[in-house]
Structure formats: structure tokens, C-alpha cells
Swiss-Prot record:
Catalytic site: 45
Binding sites annotated in the UniProt record for NAD(+): 45-46, 122-123, 148, 150, 185
Organism encoding this protein: Bacillus cereus (strain ATCC 10987 / NRS 248)
Reactions accelerated catalytically: NAD(+) + ATP = ADP + NADP(+) + H(+)
Gene behind the chain: nadK1
Function, as annotated: Involved in the regulation of the intracellular balance of NAD and NADP, and is a key enzyme in the biosynthesis of NADP. Catalyzes specifically the phosphorylation on 2'-hydroxyl of the adenosine moiety of NAD to yield NADP.
Name of this protein: NAD kinase 1
SUPFAM superfamilies: NAD kinase/diacylglycerol kinase-like
Amino acid sequence: MKFTIMSKGDQSSDALASTMKEYLLDFGFIMDEQEPDIVISVGGDGTLLYAFHRYYNRLDETAFVGVHTGHLGFYADWLPTEVEKLVIAIAKTPFQVVEYPLLEVIIRYVNGSKESQYLAMNEATVKSAEGTLVTEVEIRGEYFETFRGDGLCISTPSGSTAYNKALGGAIIHPSIEAIQIAEMASINNRVFRTVGSPLVLPKHHTCVLKPTAGMNLQITVDHLTMVHQDVKSIQYRVANEKVRFVRFRPFPFWKRVRDSFVADK
């Protein structure tokens, strides 16, 4: 089996990554940064996001597992003290794979140039680079509303605990194939009106934003931030692709939610 390890880059993460590499090589595994079967992330959830975007083009062949060198995260269930146990599990145990839905983002341009396409594991956001975002919102090909405000956040179920939650969005279990649209400081008065509530769209339902002509947009996809000009539309939907996580033991989603937001530290 082929593996690679991506480290956060700090001293403790690099040391753990080096130790795991030596152990796995001793077990006869092959280090392969180009076409790994397993990607081991050592750091935090941000490190695993980087790993996902590094290997987004081979999601059917690659599975991810995370070791947290900080506090326990939503994408990693292994602690630094459990590294030897994890290595033995990888080497000796047939692993199960859990699949999480992803968000597909397609940006189309006024001048007809080639569209830009992205996958998000957590969320994608859109804001005006200059001020208030003004955009038509279409759902399933029908006009829904004209949004005016700071921006919009479109999240996956696994990303619903991140920026989406801070915006008042619902937490959605990753077994549900859906995306969620949450508003950022919408303008609502007697003249301008939005639904003012997060929207949950099931698979096969598409949301298309059509921003005001000439507006420069700041668009994020997970940790990536870009400025796009001459945008005709931005399309969001549940992606056909899924991210796969290696599981050697139960890792209940609602326990993670409780430990992160409710339980005493």
C-alpha cells in the first residue's frame, strides 16, 4: 500500500510525521506523494483541508486520516499519543471508509472565457471586493430573491460546524447529502428583502448567483481566497465526488459536536 504524510510544519507535527513514516516503511509500505492510497494529515483540520485540495483529483483512489497535534478536530480522531496504535491499525487492520459530501462550485464569466471549477470540503463564500454584495439568487432555475449584504456562505454538512455555524446556520450530519446557504449581514428593510434564514438544499438542487455586472468578487473555497472579475454566475450544488476518510474505530459526529461546543473542557 502507498502512503504519504502531510504535516502542519511545526516542530511537533514534523517529528510525529517523521516517526510515522519510519514505522510505515518498516511495515513494508511505500512512500508515494503522487498517487497515495492513504494520506495521513498531521496537524489540525486546516492541514487536512490542504491535503484534500492537494489530492482532489484522485478522491476515488485516496482516503484520508488525521492526527491532531492541537485540540481534537472534526476531521481527525487520532492524538499524538496514539501514533503507534494508528500505524499498527493501518498495517494490520482492514479499514473501513466513510464518505462525506462535497460542494461543487462553478464560476462562469461574462466574456465567455473558460469556467472555473472547484470542490470545497467545508464551505465557499462570496463577497464584493468593494462593498455591498448585490446578486440575484436562483434555486432550481427559478428566481428566488435579490440578496444585498456582506456576502453568502455555502457549506457542506461537515463544514456546517465551521463558518456556517457562526452565521447562525444549522449543524447537518454528514450522512445527509445537502448544501446550506447562510447570509452574512443581509440588508432588510421596506425596500430590500431577503428570506433572512439559512436554506438547506438537497442533492440535485442547484443554487446559482448572478451578481451585478461589473462587480469584483472575493470568492473563497475552504482556505483558498481569490478575486474574480467579470463574473456572470456562480453555481453551487452537491458534488458528484465525495471525500473518503479511513476509520479504524467509531468516531460519532454528534459526540464531536458535543465535545467541541457543549462539553466542559
